[in-house]
């Protein structure tokens, strides 16, 4: 009987059938239940022919504060968002989140995965705001695992000894423009580069696949 060989250059075999999706949110505070979600970006990943992780599809939305949302002025000053600027082109949560879900479900199908898992820097924050918005709009067919996540702050601490995004990027030789930080799209792009760099470095060091898996 021929032993089945696992192709580790396929993404579906790298994370137990999960598709990593890197996200970042910008908000009007720290409380996911009461404070407004103002910006959301997401990037999927794929494997190249050599089994290295690379960025794939992306989406980005400016989001209108939900009804009666709390707006913390200090948070707006920190992220530089002017919620009254018509040029933001902000859309409702009920538009942005289902559109992001469509992109993720499409990527899951393309990569032969079963479900998505959130990847983010200090991921509990982003996951909490996304889940709160999903609950507010009663979104259907959520492709994400309800509690599993990959936190790049923790992973970068392990790989590089740095937990701050910009410092981890510097150690990983990833260019980082501090003036563009706290834009959800830019931060997601840099977090994606960092996540891919860490996964690929582990591959180069012989850390995956395991030579003698039990």
UniProtKB/Swiss-Prot annotation:
GO terms for molecular function: 3'-5' exonuclease activity; magnesium ion binding; nucleic acid binding; RNA exonuclease activity, producing 5'-phosphomonoesters. It is an enzyme of class 3 (hydrolase). The active site is at residue 182. GO terms for cellular component: cytosol. Mg(2+) 2 binds at residues 24, 26, 182, 187. Keywords: Exonuclease, Hydrolase, Magnesium, Metal-binding, Nuclease, tRNA processing. One of its GO terms (biological process) is DNA replication proofreading. Its EC number is 3.1.13.-. Binds two Mg(2+) per subunit. The active form of the enzyme binds two Mg(2+) ions in its active site. The first Mg(2+) forms only one salt bridge with the protein. Mg(2+) 1 binds at residue 24. It comes from the Bacteria. Its cofactor is Mg(2+). The record marks 78, 125, 147 as: Important for substrate binding and specificity. Residues 21-195 form the Exonuclease domain. SMART domains: EXOIII. Trims short 3' overhangs of a variety of RNA species, leaving a one or two nucleotide 3' overhang. Responsible for the end-turnover of tRNA: specifically removes the terminal AMP residue from uncharged tRNA (tRNA-C-C-A). Also appears to be involved in tRNA biosynthesis. NCBIfam families: RNaseT. Belongs to the RNase T family. Homodimer. This is Ribonuclease T. The gene is rnt.
């Amino acid at each position: 009987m021929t032993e089945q060989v696992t192709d580790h250059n396929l993404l579906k075999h790298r994370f137990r059938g999960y598709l990593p999706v890197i996200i970042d949110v910008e908000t009007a505070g720290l409380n996911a239940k009461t404070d407004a979600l103002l910006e959301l970006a997401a990037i999927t990943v794929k494997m190249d022919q050599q089994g290295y992780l690379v960025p794939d599809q992306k989406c980005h939305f400016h989001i209108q504060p939900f009804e009666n949302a709390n707006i913390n002025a200090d948070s707006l000053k920190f992220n530089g968002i002017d919620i009254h600027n018509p040029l933001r082109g902000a859309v409702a949560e009920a538009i942005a989140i289902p559109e992001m879900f469509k992109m993720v479900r499409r990527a899951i199908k393309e990569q032969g995965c079963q479900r998505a898992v959130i990847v983010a820097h200090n991921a509990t924050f982003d996951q909490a705001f996304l889940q709160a918005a999903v609950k507010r709009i009663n979104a259907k067919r959520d492709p994400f695992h309800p509690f599993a996540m990959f936190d790049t702050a923790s992973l970068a601490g392990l790989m590089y000894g740095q937990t701050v995004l910009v410092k981890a990027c510097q150690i990983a030789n990833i260019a980082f423009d501090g003036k563009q930080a706290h834009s959800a799209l830019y931060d997601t792009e840099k977090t994606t580069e960092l996540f891919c760099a860490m996964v690929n470095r582990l591959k180069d060091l012989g850390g995956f696949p395991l030579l003698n898996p039990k």
